[in-house]
Amino acid sequence: MARKDKKTLPASGAGIVRYFNDDTAGVKLSPKQVVIGTIIVALICIALRFTTSVGY
């Protein structure tokens, strides 16, 4: 019988993406900081909306 040498690929070859924990330069924000920042920006936008009377 003929011997079949099957080559198997790693899991990433099957469409699964592997992410590595490489430290990169830049700002590191926690999810809590992102939520608080979003709320602050929203409040500033709402305050500007009610304090300006240009075309409204």
From Swiss-Prot:
The chain crosses the membrane at residues 31-52. GO terms for biological process: protein transport. One of its GO terms (cellular component) is plasma membrane. It is a single-pass membrane protein. Its main location: membrane. It is found in: Cell membrane. It comes from the Archaea. Keywords: Cell membrane, Membrane, Protein transport, Translocation, Transmembrane, Transmembrane helix, Transport. Disulfide bonds: none annotated. Residues 53-56 are extracellular. Residues 1-30 are cytoplasmic. Involved in protein export. The function of the beta subunit is unknown, but it may be involved in stabilization of the trimeric complex. Component of the protein translocase complex. Heterotrimer consisting of alpha (SecY), beta (SecG) and gamma (SecE) subunits. Can form oligomers of the heterotrimer. Belongs to the SEC61-beta family. This is Preprotein translocase subunit SecG. The lineage of its organism: Archaea, Methanobacteriati, Methanobacteriota, Methanomada group, Methanobacteria. The gene is secG.
